Amino acid sequence: KKSGVLGRQFMINIIANLNLASPDTNYNLDGQANLTAQQTFDLYHNSIGVKIDKAYNQLMNELGYAGLEKAIKENKGIDKARLTFLQNLRGIISQEATERELPENYMQALTIEKDNQGNWQFMMPLSFPNYKRKFESIIMGILKKRVIRQNVNGGSAKQIAELGGHITSQDAGLTELKFVRYEDGRIKKAEVAIRADIAAQYGFKPGDDLSQIPEELRTIIGYRIPNQSKNSDIPLVIKYVLPDNYDQAIVVPGGITTQQGSDFDIDTLYLLMPHTKLNEETGRPEKVKVPYDKLFDENGKLDMQELNKLTPKEVDNILVDVSEAILTSPVHFKEVVTP
């Protein structure tokens, strides 16, 4: 999949054990900003809040509820706005009712008509006892799907641990996939080979020399469900692109089996990937950048106004950048690699 649900357990565990009292700037975001644990926590927590708010506002706009609220506030165009809202609500409920194969009388109950005061309404109130539970279930399901469950760029892939006995060649760039390690004074990401359809999002194809492509475009955050702690998460960098016949697969270094407690059935690795855009001058994809220099004031406090100005793709990339910063921080290295 090219998108997937942001795991609830992952969201909780990724910011666990941050020393919020420490003044040390242990977290480097996208090579732009060095943050303290408190700043990192605030940015991550509020970014998820902004993401949820944007999803909620989008749904309310699609339903016409935001327009109805505005009409009531201005005391103008209320009748038209109410009709639009009921039509949109009926449409979205109808779609869910069809998928659930509900009887036709549920749709008949949503016939829109005027009451004795001339106001638009459903033929039967949504709270009518015979229909209440089904309609409540549908509406809550819509909110859960569109607002509570947050989607991110990435998706999932079936992990295959790399086995020994294959050909390696330093000259050709063919080497074994390396696990997370401390090297040259910093934490290096684990190397993976990904399937062609995911690679295509970034303009990669089988056989490409990825060593010439910026690491920020090849960075992925992987995590498993159930997610018990940071040893269920791993920072990854794409080293190879698999042939087209590797459907839904990601090849990982053997060390991940011990780290995450994967067993020998088919385990799924869930992926967080940065959003990209096409550079019109070069014709190549590049990472959507977050203006971190604008997100904190001179006192180091998060500026919520600036955070709310960001696009959904920029907010998503904050989640990727924060996750990468935490998982590659020496402070959490032991948590990541210890089974």
Where are the model-predicted features located?
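Core catalytic machinery and nucleic-acid-binding channels of phosphodiester-processing enzymes
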Residues: 1-339
